Regions:
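Transmembrane-helix bundle segments that line or gate the permeation/cavity pathway
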Residues: 119, 123, 138-142, 149-356, ...
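Juxtamembrane boundary at the C-terminal end of a transmembrane helix
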Residues: 571-581
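Membrane-interface segments at the starts/ends of alpha-helical transmembrane spans
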Residues: 137-152, 215-226, 364-367, 404-421, ...
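Hydrophobic alpha-helical transmembrane segments and adjacent short intramembrane/lumenal linkers
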Residues: 461-469, 473, 479-530, 536-540, ...
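Long, contiguous internal "core" modules enriched in hydrophobic/ aromatic residues
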Residues: 259-465, 475-478, 482
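Alpha-helical transmembrane segments and their helix-start/interface "positive-inside/aromatic belt" motifs
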Residues: 113-114, 146-153, 184-196, 222-230, ...
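Membrane-interfacial helical/loop segments at transmembrane boundaries in membrane proteins
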Residues: 134-136, 256-257, 396-412, 483-511, ...
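N-terminal secretory/membrane targeting signals
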Residues: 93-96, 100-134
Length: 581
């Protein structure tokens, strides 16, 4: 299986025995860390970064003493080995090598491989306590749960969903997709004010990025961009609909501008551009988030946001707000696609008209979606491939395959070339496999409408992309969401406490310990499995639009279901495999 049972060791701080499942790189529960005396400005200083993980650095000796005893069969003493005595890093390398040697030792109840990884990570953590400009997804723990059962079970569940859907009558799916429950109406005036307020908040955050703390965990700009917007708002879009259409920082300023200069109000975007601008911009965003060495540096992020907001506003003036927000501005295009999975529907979807709200089944709006052009298909597949590569790029397997010792992680700067190539290759591989699955399915069904089929069936990627987004960023959202609450009370690092949260203890314990590990893993695994099952359901509903005959529709979906089963296994493996950061 992919992981052994949880290890139990003594807690060096309290003497209590408990399972060890995670090792945090970032901010632990501050309740365990005494605050330092007031600084020159009369406010409390936060603990220095180098002291945050003292307990982890000090505990690896107890790990070895408890788990392995005084020696192994080979006579190597982990606690006093010459290789392990010079530094935590050399100790980590010793664990990396000796962990495999102990695989056939007398300790049959503990997987030596997983133990070596866990001890190595514990020894390595102190070497990464300096400020790290990474992005929100770094989970920094080693999963030691018996995850192989979940992988097999998830694959079986997705495959079984195909068999169940293959015998369902098409009319049942049509009734489900068409059912709506009206819940009210609203006008558009409030949207202008909310968007204008969002623009003002963005301006304050940009100023905080330039003038505030350089610590990404203390500055509200990177926490807002990478945690609250990119993680939290994406999930809100998938549940409640297109919230971004109200909260984006362009709509209000554009309405004000177009009222002053009405000649620009009815501009349209050329159809030939399709989704290519959004595709290019999202590829740049993904590279900045995943590859660029310092995406969380507040000042750099602030200047990047200023340039992007201004260039986007100019494009909206030239091409019209509606056209550019649908197919040019990548966040709006992505959020609009994701919102098709939501349980809330707004109609009509036009900025100048009132809207009616109604409830629907999750994913029901995807069944009525129109086929995407080639650029739209590539855009949607890129959103999934980028988050998938983000998980892959941190794994021991990826780093080892590229000649990088995962226990001596050199940092992003040394991996720019490798990871840039990997990001492109992951995208190409996903496109090739998805297109091949649709092509083979259409041939099996006796159809030659490949272009229309792939443009329609690509909408089934939306539930998978949402599931990966949730699972991949869950731990970051739980911890960095708290950091954001702290940072917004003192955006300029002046000792303020605007909202009463500046001195709030950030509880990393919410994701630490055996109970938390078990709960989080089950949520993540359930999201991955559930997302793929819903993707199979959406694909079947779309297939009936292409092939009214139930047998042909089911036959066309067989290769795509195989692809989704394989991607389920891949996603669960990404969650369970050891990572370097």
């Amino acid at each position: 299986m992919f992981g052994p049972q949880l290890l139990h060791v003594d807690d060096p701080g309290g003497g209590r025995s408990g399972p060890v499942s995670k090792i945090m790189r970032r901010r632990p529960a501050q309740a365990q860390l005494p605050r330092i005396a007031a600084d020159g400005r009369g406010r409390e200083r936060r603990p220095q970064r180098n002291s945050r993980l003292e307990v982890v650095a000090a505990s690896y000796g107890l790990f070895t003493k408890r788990a392995l005893g005084a020696s192994t069969k080979s006579g190597t003493h982990f606690g006093t080995s010459t290789r392990a005595s010079s530094s935590p890093l050399s100790f980590a390398n010793a664990m990396w090598q000796d962990g495999w040697m102990a695989a056939d030792s007398e300790h049959k109840s503990i997987s030596a491989r997983a133990l070596g990884i866990a001890l190595s990570a514990a020894a390595l953590v102190p070497h990464f306590t300096t400020p790290a400009f990474a992005h929100a997804s770094e989970r920094g723990y080693v999963m030691l749960l018996p995850t192989g059962y979940y992988v097999v079970g998830g694959a079986v569940a997705v495959a079984a969903s195909f068999l169940v859907l293959a015998v369902l009558p098409p009319r049942l799916l049509e009734r489900i997709s068409a059912s709506r429950l009206p819940i009210g109406q609203f006008g558009d005036a409030a949207r202008i004010w909310i968007s204008t307020l969002a623009f003002a908040v963005l301006a304050i955050l940009v100023a905080a990025g330039i003038l505030g703390s350089r610590d990404p965990l203390s500055n509200p700009l990177p926490l807002t961009v990478w945690t609250l917007v990119w993680v939290g708002l994406t999930l809100l879009q998938g549940v409640f609909g297109n919230v971004w259409s109200w909260t984006n920082p362009w709509y209000g300023p554009w309405r004000i501008f177009s009222s002053v200069f009405p000649a620009f109000r009815d501009r349209t975007m050329p159809q030939g551009l399709a989704y290519w601008p959004a595709l290019i911009l999202f590829a740049s965003f993904a590279w900045f988030e995943l590859i660029y060495p310092a995406p969380e540096d507040p000042a750099r992020l602030a200047f990047a946001l200023m340039a992007y907001w201004l260039s986007t506003f100019v494009c909206m003036i030239i091409f019209g707000y509606e056209g550019w927000s649908r197919r040019g501005e990548f966040l709006s295009a992505f959020f609009r696609m994701v919102s098709r999975f939501a349980i809330v529907e707004t109609t009509p979807d036009h900025p100048s008209e009132g809207r009616a709200l109604s409830l629907c089944w999750p994913g029901a709006k995807l069944w009525s979606a129109q086929a995407l052009p080639a650029s739209g298909m590539l855009f949607l597949l890129l959103t999934l491939s980028s988050v998938s590569f983000d998980g892959l790029s941190k794994t021991f397997s990826w780093l080892g395959a590229n000649g990088v010792n995962p226990l001596e992680f050199p940092g992003r700067s040394a991996l720019v070339g490798i990871n840039s190539a990997g990001l492109v290759l992951m995208f190409i591989a996903l496109v090739a496999v998805f297109f091949a699955a649709v092509f083979v399915g259409e041939r099996l069904a006796g159809s030659i409408s490949f272009g229309k089929a792939v443009g329609l069936l690509v909408w089934s990627i939306v539930p998978i992309a949402l599931a990966y987004h949730f699972s991949h960023y869950l731990t970051a959202l739980l911890v960095n969401g708290q950091n954001a609450l702290v940072a917004i009370s003192d955006p300029f690092d002046r000792g303020w406490n605007l909202f009463g949260t500046a001195h709030m203890n950030v509880g990393a314990g919410v994701i630490m310990g055996s109970d938390a590990a078990w709960i989080i893993w089950n949520f993540q695994a359930a999201a991955i499995i559930g997302g793929h099952i819903l993707a199979v359901l959406v694909a079947h509903g779309l297939a009936f639009r292409l092939h009214p005959a139930r047998s042909r529709a089911a036959l066309s979906q067989f290769p795509l279901t195989v692809f989704m089963v394989a991607y389920t296994v891949f996603g669960l493996w990404l969650l369970s495999t050891p990572t370097a950061v």
